[in-house]
C-alpha cells in the first residue's frame, strides 16, 4: 500500500502514533487530519497547523486515497464506517514502516503479557553482541520514529496494531502467551486470538515463528500453523523438556532445536519468575536464529537490567530486596511477581479492577504482610481479612515507610518489599509510571540516608 506524492491521505488520531504518521507523510502527500479529543487537536495545532484539522463530517474525508488509523481507535468508530462506505483503504503506521524497511530484519513480538520485557531483552542480547536492533512499536517509540538501523528492528506489537496490518510481514515472530484482555475492543476471545495470530500472516518459508506451547490458545495457533507448513516453527516451554524446541525448567535452558545442549541460567534478579522464563526462552530462540552462540546469549541475559516498573529490581538495603512492579495493574499480572518471591511485604492499591485481588488468594502464603492504600484499600482488606496480616494506609508513601519498618524487624535471611498494585493508578497518580517513580524515589531517599 504505497503512498504517492499526489495522494490525498487522512490521518485519524493524534496520539504518539498519529503525530509520527503526520511527520512522516507531511512532505509526501496532501493530508487532512482529525482527533475526537479537543486536547489532542490543540496539541496538534501547536505542533503543526490547524489548517490540516478537518472534522470527519466534511466531504473531504469521503474522497481520500487512504486513511491512516491510529491503533487506539476502535474499529466501530464512524471513521471506519466512512472508509467502508466510500471504499477507502485503511492502513497503519506499521504497514508504512514496513514499506520503508524492505531489506531489514524485522523481529516482531506479541502476547498478552511480557511483550515489552521480551522486546527489550532481545534488543539487549543483540546489542551486547555488536548487532544494532533498536526497539520500537508498542514499547513506547512509534515505529516511524525509530532510530536508523542497518541491521533490523525489534518491534513490540499489540493486538490493536495487529488488527490493522495488511502488508507487514516479520522475519521472526514471537507469540508469548494469550489470556483474556481487551475484550471490549475485540468483542470476544475469538476476536482477540485472531488479532494476535495475525503476527504470522504473510511470513515466507524462510521466516520463523516462535510460540509458547504451554499456553492453550498459543498451542492451538502453533498446531494450525504446523499444518500449513509455510513457516519454520520453534516451540518453547517452561513446564517440560521438549524433544524439539527450547525449554527452561528449574533454571536450566535446554536447546533441542538448534543442537542438543543445556545450560544453567546465570541468576538475574530482573528476570525472576516463570513468566520471565517464557521471555528468556523466546529471546534465546531469536538470538540463535540471528546466529549468536549459546554461551554469548546466556552471558547477555545475565546482564539485562530489566525495564522500569516491570518487576524492576532496585537493590538491597538491610537484607531487604526492593522490587518495583508498578506495571502490574491487575491481579493476573501481580500474581507473576508474587509467585517469583517469598517473604513478601506487599504494597497494593489504587482503583481496583474487576475481581480485585481474588486471583492472588492462592499465593497469600508468600505474603508476610500487606499494605493497602488508595480507593481499593477497604475492598482488598475485606478479601485479606483473617488470611494474611495487613495494614490500611493513606497512600503509597506511608505504605512504603511502614513496610520498611516492619521488614527491618524481620529476622528472616531475605525479605522482599514488592510494589505490585493490582490497580489502575488514577486516584493518586497520572499513570503507572508516575506511581513507580515515587516508589523509586522513596527507595533512593532511603538509600541515601544510610
Swiss-Prot record:
Entries under SUPFAM superfamilies matching the protein: MurCD N-terminal domain, MurD-like peptide ligases, catalytic domain, MurD-like peptide ligases, peptide-binding domain
The EC number(s) this enzyme carries: 6.3.2.9
Broadest EC class assigned to this enzyme: ligase
Catalytic function, reaction form: UDP-N-acetyl-alpha-D-muramoyl-L-alanine + D-glutamate + ATP = UDP-N-acetyl-alpha-D-muramoyl-L-alanyl-D-glutamate + ADP + phosphate + H(+)
Name the UniProt record assigns to this protein: UDP-N-acetylmuramoylalanine--D-glutamate ligase
Source superkingdom: Bacteria
GO cellular component: cytoplasm
Organism for this UniProt entry: Rickettsia bellii (strain RML369-C)
Protein family (similarity comment): Belongs to the MurCDEF family.
Key words of the record: ATP-binding, Cell cycle, Cell division, Cell shape, Cell wall biogenesis/degradation, Cytoplasm, Ligase, Nucleotide-binding, Peptidoglycan synthesis
Gene3D superfamilies: Mur ligase, C-terminal domain, Mur-like, catalytic domain, NAD(P)-binding Rossmann-like Domain
Function: Cell wall formation. Catalyzes the addition of glutamate to the nucleotide precursor UDP-N-acetylmuramoyl-L-alanine (UMA).
A single MF term (Gene Ontology): UDP-N-acetylmuramoylalanine-D-glutamate ligase activity
One BP term from GO: cell wall organization
Pathways involved: Cell wall biogenesis; peptidoglycan biosynthesis
Binding sites annotated in the UniProt record for ATP: 111-117
Subcellular location: Cytoplasm
Amino acid at each position: 500500500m504505497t503512498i504517492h506524492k499526489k495522494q490525498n491521505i487522512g490521518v485519524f488520531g493524534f496520539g504518539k502514533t498519529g503525530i509520527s504518521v503526520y511527520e512522516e507523510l507531511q512532505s509526501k502527500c496532501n493530508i487532512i487530519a482529525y482527533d475526537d479529543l479537543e486536547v489532542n487537536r490543540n496539541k496538534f495545532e501547536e505542533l503543526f497547523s490547524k489548517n490540516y484539522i478537518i472534522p470527519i463530517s466534511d466531504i473531504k474525508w469521503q474522497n481520500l486515497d487512504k486513511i491512516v488509523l491510529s491503533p487506539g481507535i476502535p474499529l466501530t468508530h464512524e471513521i471506519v464506517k466512512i472508509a467502508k462506505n466510500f471504499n477507502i483503504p485503511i492502513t497503519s503506521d506499521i504497514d508504512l514502516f514496513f514499506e520503508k524497511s524492505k531489506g531489514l530484519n524485522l523481529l516482531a513480538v506479541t502476547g498478552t503479557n511480557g511483550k515489552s520485557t521480551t522486546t527489550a531483552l532481545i534488543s539487549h542480547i543483540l546489542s551486547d553482541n555488536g548487532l544494532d536492533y533498536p526497539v520500537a512499536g508498542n514499547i513506547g517509540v512509534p515505529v516511524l520514529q525509530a532510530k536508523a538501523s542497518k541491521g533490523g528492528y525489534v518491534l513490540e506489537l499489540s493486538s490493536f496494531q495487529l488488527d490493522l496490518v495488511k502488508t507487514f510481514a516479520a522475519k521472526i515472530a514471537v507469540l508469548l502467551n494469550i489470556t483474556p484482555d481487551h475484550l471490549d475492543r475485540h468483542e470476544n476471545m475469538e476476536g482477540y486470538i485472531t488479532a494476535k495470530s495475525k503476527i504470522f500472516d504473510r511470513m515466507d518459508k524462510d521466516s520463523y515463528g516462535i510460540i509458547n506451547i504451554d499456553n492453550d490458545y498459543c498451542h492451538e495457533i502453533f498446531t494450525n500453523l504446523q499444518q500449513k507448513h509455510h513457516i519454520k516453527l520453534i516451540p518453547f516451554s517452561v513446564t517440560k523438556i521438549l524433544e524439539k524446541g527450547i525449554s527452561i525448567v528449574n533454571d536450566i535452558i535446554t536447546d533441542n532445536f538448534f543442537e542438543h545442549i543445556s545450560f544453567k541460567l546465570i541468576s538475574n534478579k530482573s528476570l525472576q519468575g516463570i513468566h520471565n522464563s517464557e521471555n528468556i526462552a523466546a529471546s534465546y530462540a531469536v538470538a540463535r536464529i540471528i546466529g549468536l552462540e549459546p554461551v554469548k546469549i546466556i552471558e547477555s541475559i545475565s546482564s539485562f537490567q530489566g525495564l522500569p516498573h516491570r518487576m524492576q529490581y532496585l537493590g538491597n538495603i538491610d537484607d531487604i530486596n526492593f522490587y518495583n512492579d508498578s506495571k502490574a495493574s491487575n491481579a493476573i499480572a501481580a500474581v507473576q511477581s508474587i509467585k517469583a518471591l517469598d517473604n513478601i511485604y506487599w504494597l497494593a492499591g489504587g482503583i481496583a479492577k474487576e475481581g480485585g485481588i481474588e486471583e492472588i488468594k492462592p499465593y497469600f502464603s508468600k505474603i508476610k504482610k500487606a499494605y493497602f492504600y488508595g480507593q481499593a484499600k477497604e475492598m482488598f482488606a475485606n478479601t485479606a481479612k483473617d488470611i494474611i496480616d495487613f495494614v490500611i494506609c493513606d497512600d503509597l508513601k506511608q505504605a512504603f515507610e511502614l513496610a520498611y519498618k516492619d521488614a527491618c524487624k524481620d529476622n528472616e535471611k531475605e525479605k522482599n518489599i514488592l510494589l505490585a498494585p493490582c490497580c489502575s493508578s488514577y486516584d493518586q497518580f497520572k499513570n503507572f509510571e508516575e506511581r513507580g517513580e515515587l516508589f523509586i524515589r522513596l527507595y533512593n531517599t532511603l538509600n541515601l540516608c544510610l
